[in-house]
Amino acid sequence: MKIQLNNIQVRANHGCWREEEVIGGDYRVDVWLEGNFEVSAESDDLEKTIDYVAVKELVYAEMNVRAKLIETVLVRMHSAMKVRFPNAHSVGIRLTKINAPMGHQVESVSVEMEG
């Protein structure tokens, strides 16, 4: 079974440019966790599944730690998810930087990791 949180919207100060550090930018995070959640489905017990609120809070906490590269944020967030949710067999994250300052109009830039 896969649990997904889609389009978590975050404002953060990642990037190589001084303006990004000061002004910040908009980000979108998608997280999916795979595991055997049938027991929680049968028991209707939150303690036996992934708490969606805890996932969202972990995303916000990791996005709040500044980095120059979104790749750095992604790897750090992925590691934290694996530690926090050991009952997930696999964790996937897509981190999207909206309107990255690239000199040309690009809607977004994304990095993704799963495992």
Predicted ranges, named:
Residues 1-115:
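N-terminal, polar/charged subdomain of small-to-medium soluble alpha/beta proteins
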